[in-house]
């Protein structure tokens, strides 16, 4: 089991839901956490909640992952502050209900910008330093929707399928470098992103369930890469 104490993590989409829960769980393990998102007040609330419960090292940074220059600045400032980045969690995401036949191009572009480009921008920013230190772990939050498409989820599903493919390809590119990469594909999770979406008789997952999956992947021995995790409600 890998010890996470004093490692440095950047978590995108950390103002609520899965990102906030992963950040809090990492802090519980002694990880120094940089919370990023677009909502300053909600980020501050998450940071306060973490700091109230433990002696945690928590920083916040207002970042829009669709802006490459903001992502680059985030990574550089984090390295200046803490020396390195050991963990990147790509949790920033956007889910809009939009069928192709509706022709809502703005919704499509928004999901592509956040879910695909945002993921690529953060990976691109942290990867050189991770390769230089021969260690690091990138966790990308994908979705069951990347495999199971409904008539209203075509573009969202496509964007999350892309996240899955990016992770699978990156794992092959990073073989023997010491840098690991994991995609976590949750089923329906009780977060602001899912809203009032009907999931039938199944109970929604708690964001903590996804956080525990992330910790499991991170704590594996350095020669083990948990490349893909699927988490479904019972």
UniProtKB/Swiss-Prot annotation:
Q: Supply the Gene3D superfamilies for this chain.
A: NAD(P)-binding Rossmann-like Domain
Enzyme Commission code: 1.-.-.-
GO MF entries:
oxidoreductase activity
The UniProt keyword set, sorted, is: Oxidoreductase
Record-linked Pfam families: adh_short (PF00106)
Q: Where does NADP(+) bind?
A: 10-34
Q: Where does substrate bind?
A: 143
Task: Please tell me which top-level EC class this enzyme sits in.
Answer: oxidoreductase
**Organism superkingdom:** Bacteria
Which Cys pairs does UniProt list as disulfide-bonded? none
The residues responsible for catalysis, as annotated, are 156 (proton acceptor)
Under the heading PANTHER family, the entry gives: DEHYDROGENASE/REDUCTASE SDR FAMILY MEMBER 11 (PTHR43115), DEHYDROGENASE_REDUCTASE SDR FAMILY MEMBER 11 (PTHR43115:SF4)
Which family, according to the similarity comment? Belongs to the short-chain dehydrogenases/reductases (SDR) family.
Under which name does UniProt file this protein?
A: Uncharacterized oxidoreductase SSP0419
């Amino acid at each position: 089991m890998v010890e996470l104490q004093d490692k440095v993590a950047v978590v995108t989409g950390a103002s609520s839901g899965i990102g906030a829960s992963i950040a809090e769980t990492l802090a519980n393990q002694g990880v120094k956490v940089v919370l990023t998102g677009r909502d300053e007040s909600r980020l501050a609330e998450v940071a306060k909640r973490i700091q109230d419960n433990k002696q945690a090292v928590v920083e916040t940074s207002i970042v829009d992952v669709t802006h490459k220059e903001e992502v680059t600045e985030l990574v550089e400032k984090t390295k200046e502050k803490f020396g390195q980045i050991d963990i990147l969690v790509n949790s920033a995401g956007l889910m809009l209900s939009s069928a192709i036949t509706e022709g809502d191009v703005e919704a499509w572009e928004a999901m592509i910008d956040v879910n695909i480009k945002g993921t690529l921008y953060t990976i691109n920013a942290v990867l050189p330093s991770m390769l230089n230190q021969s260690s690091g772990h990138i966790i990308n939050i994908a979705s069951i929707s990347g495999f199971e498409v409904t008539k209203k989820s075509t573009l969202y599903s496509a964007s999350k399928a892309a996240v899955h493919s990016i992770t699978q390809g990156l794992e092959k590119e990073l073989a023997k470098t010491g840098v690991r990469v994991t995609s976590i594909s949750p089923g329906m999770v009780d977060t602001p992103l899912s809203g009032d979406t009907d999931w039938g008789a199944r109970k929604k997952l708690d964001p903590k369930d996804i956080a525990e999956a992330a910790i499991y992947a991170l704590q594996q021995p350095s020669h083990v890469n948990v490349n893909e995790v699927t988490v479904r409600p019972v």
